[in-house]
């Protein structure tokens, strides 16, 4: 796997002569991932405590996650900043959040070292590294890593997902949004996916978009691995749960968290 960013242009490997018969073209360079490169899916749920999941003995049943855990590994010791943007920045760059200028959230940016929320270009994301080594990359959900003054549809887009290694982006840029009428961006274009769709819910939309993208990559580029980053806005406030799920848990938490 290439470890230098950006990838250097390969020197000409053919030969040129005075005439065509004396010349030999070189193969057209194409970046391809290693044959054993795995697909990678990273799912982040916002503001969910370690003790909430049924997988770890919590009160919320999570059968899908339980199945994944049974077939993989469960970690019970980890460290985060307990803040949204710093944790995401550290996860995507592999660096301390202060080193990539994300000591707080973009809404609280200031001029002190490590807190201006301007991720420097030399801090490559895992998406940039993987894309330059033959991966398809997609981000679906909450980004929250763009400086506030760069969030408009007029750009600049350097620190939007599409400028930081993701071929495909569908989601929200900010900290929180309505699940029913969200300010969604498709790449860098603002869209209103809820219009004309009864019972629309952002989390369901994001999952559908993720599945569709993975299917398209698999069909259009067989054998090409993907890196998919799915940071859902849920369960961050505002807490807009679908009615069917509210009804499903009716009465179970009426006594409050102290009774659990």
Residue ranges and their predicted role:
Residues 1-260:
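Formylglycine-dependent sulfatase
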